[in-house]
Curated annotation (Swiss-Prot):
Keyword Protein biosynthesis in record: yes
Full protein name: Threonine--tRNA ligase editing subunit
Any one GO cellular component localisation term in the record: cytoplasm
Domain of life: Archaea
Organism: Saccharolobus solfataricus (strain ATCC 35092 / DSM 1617 / JCM 11322 / P2) (Sulfolobus solfataricus)
Function: Freestanding tRNA editing subunit of threonine--tRNA ligase, the catalytic subunit is AC Q97VW8. Deacylates (edits) mischarged L-seryl-tRNA(Thr) in trans, removing L-serine, has no aminoacylation activity. In vitro when both subunits are present, or if the 2 subunits are fused, L-seryl-tRNA(Thr) is no longer produced. Has no activity on correctly acylated L-seryl-tRNA(Ser) or L-threonyl-tRNA(Thr). Editing is probably catalyzed by the 2'-OH of A76 of tRNA(Thr).
InterPro entries linked: Anticodon-bd, Anticodon-bd_dom_sf, DTD-like_sf, Threonyl-tRNA_syn_edit_dom_arc, ThrRS_anticodon
Subunit composition and interactions: Probably interacts with its catalytic subunit (AC Q97VW8); a subunit fusion (in the order edit-catalytic) is fully functional.
Amino acid sequence: MIILFIHASDFSFNVKERAIKEPEEAKLKSIELKNTLVCFTTVEKGDDEEILSKAIDDILDVYSKVKADSVVIYPYAHLSSNLANPDTAIKILESLENLLKDKVKVYRAPFGWYKAFSISCYGHPLSELSRRIRKTEELEKSEELKYCEKFGFPSSSESAFMRRATIGYLRNLFQPLFESENNENVRDGEMSILYQNVESGRILPCINENPRIVVVYGGVRELNFPKEINDSKNRIRVWWVNESKIYVDVGRLIYYFILESVKQQPPTLPDWLNPIQVRLLPVKKDFLDFSIQVAERLRKEGIRVNIDDLDDSLGNKIRRAGTDWIPFVIVIGEREVKTNTLTVKIRARNEQKSMTVEELVKEIKDEVKERQNLPLYYTLYRHKNN
């Protein structure tokens, strides 16, 4: 349902002739009113009792705000192309009138007739309003999304940063390896590289939102994808070296080594790839200004830094930094402000060290070397990123 509200100082209409074969009976053929709220109303397909309830609430809301003396329900089919059939529209308009009768003085123009009308609008800020009234829709979570939540992980600004950083680094790394030897015209399909991702182990999207059409030129190789994919989970590749069998590409061993490495030290990302290289944790708000000064010095050196200035306990701030895999975590307290030195927790070595700002900058730059000049995508304060 769509309603156009006009708060009119003067409004009148006169019924002229039939607009459809079977209009409703024209009980009210003419009217003249002052200070009335005219509701030009279009009934759409699917409108029901829920729509009526919302429409009444909207009409009464506008009526009370503009302080009109009466309400006019005026059928108006020109606000939508998705019109309900005449019988349904008449029933809904009648119900709308009957439900409003007990609350306000209401008049309803007949449906299915051509009418001449005259209107004079007050022109104040609330004198012209429109409302589109829809049914409440219950949203269901798709089965595909359930699998994505179970096996996938949410994309974030951090992942976008890491993807761009990695692509940029690899492009610079491999660019010198490519040379153009022959610029002769080669048609599509005559020179191509075919490969399979059956055992690549790379992370693939859970839902392919952009399926592609691939043209394969026949007669080159018979591809047995269904058979190979189904059998890949049971495949063990065997390499023969000096007449002895060596088993490689065994998933269980890979997982074992990963788990063992996790037990030895916390998981880390290379410093050059980490979206945030340094996080400052002020113990309380009194140390926020000093934290900002330190952060600005680090930013000027190209270090990606932010401040966890949330009104929270220090323990929670340290846990958040650990969850985010921050390489260098610095707690800012009274000692740091007085001595102008930093107590830095280094994640990769699981150690705590006292440093000056200059020493911290040197350590990070020595680690990332030429890969340090990546874009600074992040604002200074952590709460502005959430």
